[in-house]
């Protein structure tokens, strides 16, 4: 069997930054460092940070007063920020700057009293944090996941409306939903550029090319990773078998029935180290050659917070 690697794949700038923030906080301040929610959605990464002294919690009530806490790359609501401030917690914010950009759009709509529609997945921490930027009772923010949800929206055609999206959605599904929104609400406003981030876009486009050449696409990523799930779904939509995995032990022999070419990609929160471990495991199942596709070069970089950056330089 032949392995073809998608390019780009794996870590994005926001994930790199978030992991660096936890690592530097541990190095400078020592354990324990509390992290609200998994800093990124990858079991391999989270377990590694936990072994170094990071304590992952779902609510700030689990964090002692005055302790150091890191907000995950997915972002948090204004209520969570206020709670941290009220409890005198030392906060390092690992929210991806591209998520923060969407937060600013929602906050602007809230200040103006413009009703906002967020396209995203219910229950995802990014969605919860984004919706939590809206506080104006005279307006409101409403979540939709798909075209069918639009019919249940309470707004009128002539209402002052704006929309935003989660950063890790399917490009195709989101384009369809936005088109349907604009059809029902012709005057609706939206971002000048799609809120779906560069890494999500690039990895989905790379999977389109990968799927054309593969009998099976393996997506390295955890089950709670939105962008990783979208990659597996996209390959399946293109008529190619796909599997999502985040451990070499997940691999099953029957995946390779009638498979000559295995395509491999990785979600934005999956490390290259894990990809290479999976490749090593695949060699035991008969994979004997590796090819890497040409792809877009990503040079995006996000700085860590100033307090950590100064220590890093010194």
UniProtKB/Swiss-Prot annotation:
GO terms for molecular function: 4 iron, 4 sulfur cluster binding; 4-hydroxy-3-methylbut-2-enyl diphosphate reductase activity; metal ion binding. Coiled coil: none annotated. The active site is at residue 126. Binds 1 [4Fe-4S] cluster per subunit. Dimethylallyl diphosphate binds at residues 41, 74, 124, 225-227, 269. Pfam families: LYTB. Signal peptide: none annotated. GO terms for biological process: dimethylallyl diphosphate biosynthetic process; isopentenyl diphosphate biosynthetic process, methylerythritol 4-phosphate pathway; terpenoid biosynthetic process. Keywords: 4Fe-4S, Iron, Iron-sulfur, Isoprene biosynthesis, Metal-binding, Oxidoreductase. Pathway: Isoprenoid biosynthesis; dimethylallyl diphosphate biosynthesis; dimethylallyl diphosphate from (2E)-4-hydroxy-3-methylbutenyl diphosphate: step 1/1; Isoprenoid biosynthesis; isopentenyl diphosphate biosynthesis via DXP pathway; isopentenyl diphosphate from 1-deoxy-D-xylulose 5-phosphate: step 6/6. Belongs to the IspH family. Catalyzes the conversion of 1-hydroxy-2-methyl-2-(E)-butenyl 4-diphosphate (HMBPP) into a mixture of isopentenyl diphosphate (IPP) and dimethylallyl diphosphate (DMAPP). Acts in the terminal step of the DOXP/MEP pathway for isoprenoid precursor biosynthesis. This is 4-hydroxy-3-methylbut-2-enyl diphosphate reductase. It comes from Haemophilus influenzae (strain PittEE).
